[in-house]
Design a protein with these regions (language model features):
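Short amphipathic alpha-helical surface micro-motifs
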Residues: 40-41, 130-132
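Short, surface-exposed recognition loops or helix-turn segments adjacent to catalytic cores
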Residues: 118-130
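N-terminal accessory/precursor segments of enzymes
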Residues: 12, 133-134
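A short aromatic-anchored loop/beta-hairpin motif
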Residues: 2-110, 114-120
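Conserved small/polar residues in nucleotide/adenosyl-binding loops
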Residues: 139
Length: 139
């Protein structure tokens, strides 16, 4: 694969309800299902990713815009429990996200060069957005 080639792009809704509906072990509440069409879409994406040669998965979630600027994860691992402030009874999810910090730093630098307000998040206690957690859990 040539260096720097984008091999796939997708736009994926990522409400935390999707994870809740799957009843994964790491989510505390349980559900009786729901959101099937969206869950099937994520399952299809996961199958597609298994057929593609790629080095990194980049997730951009617009929810981070509610903070100031665009944030990039700047530690090798973010591991915690996410309790969503809007849906605390639905989304209490234990996550463990691995980060390619070098790639994240380069993306942050390039975005900044193009006039985007950016920040590297190097605080281990930073609350990772549920859009990222939802997307990572399915891919």
């Amino acid at each position: 694969m040539p260096k720097g080639e984008i091999v796939l792009g997708c736009l994926a809704p990522h409400p935390p309800h999707v994870v809740y509906a799957e009843n994964p072990d790491q989510n505390e509440p349980v559900s009786e299902g729901g959101w099937e069409t969206l869950r099937w879409g994520y399952n299809r994406l996961a199958r597609k990713l298994k057929t593609i040669d790629y080095d990194a998965l980049v997730i951009f979630t617009p929810h981070w815009q509610t903070y100031i600027g665009t944030h990039f994860l700047g530690l090798p691992e973010f591991k915690s429990k996410s309790v969503d402030p809007v849906f605390p009874n639905i989304f209490r999810y234990n996550y463990d996200i691995k980060v390619d910090v070098e790639l994240s730093e380069i993306m942050c630098e390039k975005a900044s060069e193009h006039g985007i307000i950016t920040k590297m998040m190097r605080n281990q206690d930073f609350r990772v957005d549920y859009g990222t957690i939802t997307s990572v859990s399915y891919t």
